[in-house]
């Protein structure tokens, strides 16, 4: 399975994050930046008959990225998590958001399907 970040070049880098919001389905994160009305949305996308969403580790709060400046986002590896019971097969891909100060934030893109479909990250710029 290929792990990609669609439109990664649209990510606003080296710009300080002022606020983050996640939607109720946990499949889109809105990242707002200091001193501008520009923002990114990072979305969990899914093929045809599958579902994707973000999972955050309990000790890793999304709000902890406020004040940071993004360097890039990269795929790390697939990991095991308890079954989601959404569909038959789960793929849990660990991603890392790297910051210009050398720190990072890890999160998981979860995808559940019948085993034939997958999910991916997509970056949107506004």
Swiss-Prot record:
InterPro entries: DUF7448. It holds the Pfam family DUF7448. It comes from the Viruses. This is Uncharacterized protein L278. It comes from Acanthamoeba polyphaga mimivirus (APMV). The lineage of its organism: Viruses, Varidnaviria, Bamfordvirae, Nucleocytoviricota, Megaviricetes.
